[in-house]
Amino acid sequence: MGQKVHPIGLRVGIIRDWESKWYAEKDYATLLHEDIKVRKYIETALKDASVSKVEIERAANRVNITIHTAKPGKVIGKGGTEVENLRKYLSELTGKRVHINIIEIKRADLDARLVAENIARQLENRVSFRRAQKQAIQRTIRAGAKGIKTQVSGRLGGADIARAEHYSEGTVPLHTLRADIDYAHAEADTTYGKLGVKVWIYRGEVLPTKKSVEGGK
């Protein structure tokens, strides 16, 4: 089962936290679609800022958005202009006051989303899929990961029949719930069509906090 299920979804409530934190009854579907729009807009507007994830927290008339990025300078902009423009647009989109927090990702090579996007970018620049994966694996292991697995699927090298090739190093224990495994997928647009990129990174074991253990009783 651990091989098929989404590694992050499987660990939510155990060692991972929710990326959207709010409660709603009748408005649940509306707020869910609003979250999707917010995340899509941020991904599009900040596509060159190496954004890993967006956390959304809602209060009565306020929305707190936390952006995890490897390039905080690009998100903030000169004199804070970019982040202010982003805040204004998101305020119009949600109809509420928006507060934006920016958290810098210190080690981008240990973030599955950034590693997957980096491989996808290289594939778009016609780098060999084998070379792109092997270089990413070397950088991630050098950064301190316990294990990594990458997979590229599609018309590899312009072949007529689509296939998938994966490489791995170290261990990636997908069944161990206390294992801190980061997972992400990305897409590369090539002349032969789309290629899918998947990345699993094992960063070591995390013991559940006392709070989460008590909550599960």
From Swiss-Prot:
One Pfam entry name: Ribosomal_S3_C
GO molecular function, one term: mRNA binding
Cysteines engaged in disulfide bonds, as pairs: none
The entry's keywords: Ribonucleoprotein, Ribosomal protein, RNA-binding, rRNA-binding
HAMAP family noted in UniProt: Ribosomal_uS3_B (MF_01309_B)
Entry similarity comment: Belongs to the universal ribosomal protein uS3 family.
Function of the molecule: Binds the lower part of the 30S subunit head. Binds mRNA in the 70S ribosome, positioning it for translation.
Protein name: Small ribosomal subunit protein uS3
Natural source organism: Lysinibacillus sphaericus (strain C3-41)
